[in-house]
Structures are given as C-alpha cells and as structure tokens.
C-alpha cells in the first residue's frame, strides 16, 4: 500500500529523524514520569515543558482495536483497499497508542490482543520512513 509522506515540523522532527534511523522514540516527561504521543510542546498531564524529552522505546505493543477500511476518500490509499487500521497500545505505556495498517496481515486475520513489533516503511514521495507494526504472536 502507498504510504502518505509526512512533512516533519520542528515539534515532530526528532520523531521522524529517529524513524529514518529505524528507532521508535516518543516524548517522556521526567517531571510526572509519563510518556506521551503525538508530540506536544509541553507535558499533557502536568503542563511542564522543561521536563519533556525524547526516549527510545522497545518497539513492542499489543493490538487493542481495529477496523477494516473498505472505502477511503484518500486517493493514494484507494488501490490498497480494503486495509487494516489497528490501534496499538505501547508496552512501555499502554495508555499511549499509535495507529498501523499492519502490513502483511490479511484484513480478516487481525487478532485483538496480539503482540506486535514496530517496523519502518519508506514513503515513496519523500523517502521518509514511518513506523508500522507487524503481528508477532
């Protein structure tokens, strides 16, 4: 499936730079000891901006929900229909979630609760790598 190419800004550039190195990083607040995603200028829990830093994660999680898209309005995704969209809870902080198309997983075989690990796919328009997830158990 074609991947949309993100255009990183100053706030999410560290995230996408790490993706290009095939590392998964998200923000962590050293003040309240919590992870957060997507990136924000300050901690979404305590409001502190001086204590927010980027930390590398294990790249493991679990599928907590999913849908199958049969009719997308996004023209670049139409050739890949139907496709999965899964919600992934990160092992380090299950309250923090990411979305994935689960490349290589048939639309009728997405097990809720299954373990997943991050992989990185290259977008065709810019060459930017983006995180995706694959089922491992």
Where are these regions (language model features)?
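Short functional micro-motifs and their immediate structural scaffolds
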Residues: 37, 51-53
């Amino acid at each position: 499936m074609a991947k949309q190419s993100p255009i990183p800004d100053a706030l999410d550039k560290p995230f996408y730079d790490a993706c290009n190195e095939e590392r998964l990083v998200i923000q962590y607040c050293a003040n309240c000891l919590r992870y957060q995603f997507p990136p924000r200028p300050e901690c979404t829990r305590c409001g502190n901006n001086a204590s927010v830093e980027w930390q590398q994660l294990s790249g493991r999680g679990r599928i907590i929900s999913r849908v199958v898209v049969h009719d997308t309005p996004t023209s670049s995704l139409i050739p890949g229909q139907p496709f999965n969209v899964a919600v992934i809870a990160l092992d380090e902080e299950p309250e923090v979630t990411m979305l994935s198309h689960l490349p290589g997983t048939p639309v009728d075989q997405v097990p809720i609760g299954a373990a997943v690990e991050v992989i990185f796919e290259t977008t065709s328009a810019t060459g930017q790598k983006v995180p995706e997830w694959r089922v491992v158990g």
